[in-house]
Amino acid sequence: MISCWLCARKAGSLAVLVAIGLSTTLYSGLAQSETCALPSEHEGMTFPIEKVDPDWACRLYAIVDNYTTVGKVGPIRTGLPESLYHQLLDRPPLAAALINRLELGLYKSEARGSGRFWGNDGEGTAGIVQLVYQDRNSRIYYLEGSHDGRFLPHITGKAVVFLRMNPVKDTDGMEAMDSTMVSYARLDNRILSGVVTLLRPFIGGTIKRKLGKGVETVNRLSLLMRQQPDRVLFEVMNPPAFPDDEVAFVKQALERLSHSSDLIPSRTPSP
């Protein structure tokens, strides 16, 4: 949502500068090199790099070791229970479609294989997102794509996003998730890379805004699902209706959110 947001996530999914990477042959060669040692700690967070496929570890290392810009976003809170948050992360096309129907953004997403999605944030950034590793608290994504903007020319590049997720309770006692992301991006454009010192602050700021906006959009979606479930369901079933399995998923999600809200006692002001 990271889709969308990552899509947004996301979603966001989430929406970061990225692009056509090095060939598989080159990366396979790197996998055999002792210099391919992807670090496990990123901005104070430790990830289980030893569980990442060696070939993927080297593809990520090529970016992390030679990045154009690196940045941290978060923690950003999303008002969804842990299991539902993970389920939406696994469904970037559905999250993007909901965001569009509810007029929260212009995200688009399509599945392109197992753990692989195409995404477009409607604001000049588009590309492929590949899930490399996941567990209950962590995800690692590889991205490749392009960005066109008013102040930046057409640029392509690749990126690695380390996502850390922590279940929390909000101020009302509701289940929520805190998401923190560390992104490493590397430009492909040789001319831009030559003036990277001048561009780095602007590019880094753009990436952080894209990632942050993706997660914040998913949070806005979660608020609508809690506060206006009838509207969300109407948009899902309004022609052209979502596929039956997605309608069933949204109905179940809305019921779960409604039930969890009912379990929280209402606050009464002190006399």
Segment roles from a protein language model:
Residues 2-18:
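Bacterial N-terminal signal peptides that target proteins for export
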Residues 26-28:
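N-terminal signal peptide c-region/cleavage motif recognized by signal peptidases
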Residues 31-113:
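Hydrophobic ligand-binding cavity/cleft-lining segments
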Residues 34-53, 162-271:
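Terminal "cap-and-tail" regions of soluble proteins that handle hydrophobic small molecules
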Residues 75-83, 89, 153, 201-212:
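Soluble non-cytosolic domains of exported or imported proteins
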Residues 89, 100-102, 121-123, 133-135, ...:
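A mature extracytoplasmic/lumenal domain signature
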Residues 95-118, 238-254:
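Short solvent-exposed beta->alpha transition segments
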Residues 108-160:
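Glycine-rich portal/gate segments that line the openings of hydrophobic small-molecule binding cavities
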